[in-house]
């Protein structure tokens, strides 16, 4: 996974 990638993002 690329740096700064998050499976869950705060909306």
Curated annotation (Swiss-Prot):
GO terms for biological process: defense response; vasodilation. GO terms for cellular component: extracellular region. Belongs to the bradykinin-related peptide family. Produces in vitro relaxation of rat arterial smooth muscle and constriction of intestinal smooth muscle. May target bradykinin receptors (BDKRB). Expressed by the skin glands. The lineage of its organism: Eukaryota, Metazoa, Chordata, Craniata, Vertebrata. This is [Ala1,Thr6]-bradykinyl-Ser,Lys. It is found in: Secreted. The keyword Transmembrane does not apply. Keywords: Amphibian defense peptide, G-protein coupled receptor impairing toxin, Secreted, Toxin, Vasoactive, Vasodilator. InterPro entries: Bradykinin. GO terms for molecular function: hormone activity; toxin activity. It comes from Physalaemus signifer.
